[in-house]
């Protein structure tokens, strides 16, 4: 994965904890984001298609969502670029994941 895709993967992995601890809250948060974002994007744009796909995933349940959050499959990578989970992690959690990711990337990609 490219750096930004790997960073997104790490952030989405961090969502597994909240998702498994309180799935109703996390899925409701994602649904609220989707509703809000639908009005902010062109009705005929690609973002609407991604949001519709996320809605279907949310309707499929926690297991389907968790699978996409951690998958390296190209389609999952693309889905995460339009993730409805903004705001689930608080700023301290996000920053901690970013710091951990930077250390990981520097260590594992030092020769690249």
Task: Label each residue range with its predicted role.
Residues 1-57:
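The feature represents the first ordered module of a protein
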Residues 15, 25, 81, 111-112:
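Low-complexity, compositionally biased segments
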Residues 92-112:
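Long, highly charged low-complexity segments enriched in Glu/Asp and Lys/Arg with interspersed Ser/Thr
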């Amino acid at each position: 994965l490219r750096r930004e895709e790997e960073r997104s993967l790490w952030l989405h992995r961090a969502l597994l904890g909240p998702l498994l601890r309180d799935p109703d809250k996390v899925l409701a948060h994602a649904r609220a984001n989707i509703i809000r974002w639908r009005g902010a994007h062109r009705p005929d744009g690609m973002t609407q298609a991604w949001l519709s796909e996320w809605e279907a995933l949310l309707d499929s349940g926690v297991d389907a969502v968790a699978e996409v959050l951690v998958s390296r499959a190209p389609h999952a990578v693309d889905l995460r670029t339009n993730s409805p989970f903004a705001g689930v992690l608080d700023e301290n959690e996000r920053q901690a994941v970013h710091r951990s990711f930077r250390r990981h990337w520097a260590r594992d990609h030092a020769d690249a």
